[in-house]
Amino acid sequence: MNKELQPKVVFLMGPTASGKTALALELAEKHNCEIISVDSALIYRGMDIGSAKPSAEELARGPHRLIDIRDPSESYSAADFRADALSEIEQIISMGKTPLLVGGTMMYFKALLEGLSPLPSADEVIRADIQAEADANGWEALHDQLREIDPVSAERIHPNDPQRLSRALEVYRISGKSLTELTMTKSAPLPYNVVQFAIAPRERKVLHELIGQRFRIMLEQGFIDEVAQLKARDDLHLDLPSMRCVGYRQCWQYLDGEFDHDTMVEKAIAATRQLAKRQLTWLRSWPELNWLESGAEGNLVTLMRHCR
């Protein structure tokens, strides 16, 4: 089918603190579109301040789908996101509206755009067997096994990387196919006319300043109390994906007494800047991308022109 004849879907990507939400809300008010959040932190309930979740006022202006859909104790994968996002996109299109996907979790955007490899889910029994073999014979022996069944993965995975080594062996024992073979197979790409935008300040120092300002505002809004409430739960810990979100980990460690308040602020801001750097690295290699400068006057007009 001709791409131009397919229903239109708009991506608005960008690093943290670049102004994505504000621009998306403007577009939602001016254009017949609905917002889908593409953010691995916004999915969690009770993580509002540190994730910069849209306020009640902002959500009234432009409701966001796929926020507050998981408890922080639960996991959520790129495959989960793809399935949920496809369902939301179909609903929005059936209403005669344009889906506007907004966020900074590039892995989610990539999974949605390109599809995912059909890897099997984890099998705790097989995983335990692999661990028992490693305890008995060492990871080097298991790496030799991997080299026999999947030399490409064995070249890429170091014997001292037990998590990835175990997963490669687990995939083979479950499916009978190597990790290399399965990752060459992708699910169907997104069947829509996707128009992609990225927004960021022209100068990195501006983004760094925005990140610092925003984190200090979060502290004024009660971020430490928010983390303290999460920390008080018996079922949350720092190994969970939710608690690995930038800011939350550093604040948790501060509450544990690992460092003082000023150090926590420095570490949280530095971690957020590193996240922004990774996001920009993804975006610089992203194909078919239209760039917008944060705060530029013509951004809304440009978006509306492409959304017609």
Curated annotation (Swiss-Prot):
Substrate binds at residues 16-21. Disulfide bonds: none annotated. InterPro entries: Dimethylallyltransferase (IPR039657), IPT (IPR018022), P-loop_NTPase (IPR027417). Monomer. The keyword Heme does not apply. Keywords: ATP-binding, Magnesium, Nucleotide-binding, Transferase, tRNA processing. This is tRNA dimethylallyltransferase. It catalyses: adenosine(37) in tRNA + dimethylallyl diphosphate = N(6)-dimethylallyladenosine(37) in tRNA + diphosphate. Its EC number is 2.5.1.75. GO terms for biological process: tRNA modification. Catalyzes the transfer of a dimethylallyl group onto the adenine at position 37 in tRNAs that read codons beginning with uridine, leading to the formation of N6-(dimethylallyl)adenosine (i(6)A). ATP binds at residues 14-21. Its cofactor is Mg(2+). Belongs to the IPP transferase family. Residues 39-42, 163-167, 244-249 are annotated as: Interaction with substrate tRNA. It comes from Shewanella oneidensis (strain ATCC 700550 / JCM 31522 / CIP 106686 / LMG 19005 / NCIMB 14063 / MR-1). The lineage of its organism: Bacteria, Pseudomonadati, Pseudomonadota, Gammaproteobacteria, Alteromonadales. GO terms for molecular function: ATP binding; tRNA dimethylallyltransferase activity. The record marks 105, 127 as: Interaction with substrate tRNA.
